[in-house]
Amino acid sequence: MIRVAIPTGRMLEQALDFLRNFDDRLLDEEKGRKLRIHGERFEVFLAKPWDLPLYVEERVVDLGIIGRDVIWEQEKNVVNLISLPFGYCKMVIAGYPYVSLKGNGKEIRIATKYENITKKLLENRWGKIKIIKLNGSVELGPILNISDLIVDIVETGKTLRDNGLEVKEVLFESSACLISNVVSFAYLRKEILSFVKEVRKLNDKCN
């Protein structure tokens, strides 16, 4: 049986529905009461999104389903197997309409939970940036005037608009992806590659 971690939160239902395409023994009634769901093919663990890559890296589980944005931010030593047809979102720079992306030599304050991504993508462009690491609602950065801009993922942009903010630039698009532990990929190579082949067929049907 392959151990799979899926993220709690916005992608939970999508990830479970996705896995049910390959294991119909993953029952709904177990969800909500347990952090572990037993199927015929998979043993599924529900994990916080930001903890999930660590569980895969440390081989607590064999596979994980997580947003590509989290993988790029954390840079864990895992095998990135294939993109999945859900969890679509965009990594954006956002701020109040009157705030310019041109720093004009001034330090730009950026609130984000994606500290590494922000540094890699924007430090060379603007030079003088101050990253304010927030773990909660990064929209509070501009609202409380502790940042000029934010870098965050958005799906519809409604939360930004509700708080008077707008998308200034899309940095990249993200979706869910399937990742594997390095050792598990070696020892369970046949089973994992067979699963990836099935996933690829499902992806083709969705496109």
UniProtKB/Swiss-Prot annotation:
This entry's Enzyme Commission designation comes to 2.4.2.17
What is this protein identified as? Answer: ATP phosphoribosyltransferase
Pathway assigned to this chain's UniProt record = Amino-acid biosynthesis; L-histidine biosynthesis; L-histidine from 5-phospho-alpha-D-ribose 1-diphosphate: step 1/9
The listed locations are: Cytoplasm
| Single GO biological process annotation from the record | L-histidine biosynthetic process
Under Gene3D superfamilies, the record lists: Periplasmic binding protein-like II
Entry function: Catalyzes the condensation of ATP and 5-phosphoribose 1-diphosphate to form N'-(5'-phosphoribosyl)-ATP (PR-ATP). Has a crucial role in the pathway because the rate of histidine biosynthesis seems to be controlled primarily by regulation of HisG enzymatic activity.
Family stated for the protein in its record: Belongs to the ATP phosphoribosyltransferase family. Short subfamily.
Alphabetical GO CC annotations of the entry are: cytoplasm
**Entry comment, domain topic:** Lacks the C-terminal regulatory region which is replaced by HisZ.
Which species? Dictyoglomus turgidum (strain DSM 6724 / Z-1310)
Q: Which reaction does it catalyse?
A: 1-(5-phospho-beta-D-ribosyl)-ATP + diphosphate = 5-phospho-alpha-D-ribose 1-diphosphate + ATP
GO function terms (MF aspect): ATP binding; ATP phosphoribosyltransferase activity
SUPFAM superfamilies named in the record: Periplasmic binding protein-like II
Q: What class of enzyme is it?
A: transferase
Asked if the record carries the keyword Glycosyltransferase, the reply is: yes
Q: Subunit structure, per the record?
A: Heteromultimer composed of HisG and HisZ subunits.
Keyword Glycosyltransferase in the entry? The reply is yes
Task: List all disulphide bridges recorded for this chain.
Answer: none
- Offer one Pfam family short name for this entry: HisG
Q: Which UniProt keywords apply?
A: Amino-acid biosynthesis, ATP-binding, Cytoplasm, Glycosyltransferase, Histidine biosynthesis, Nucleotide-binding, Transferase
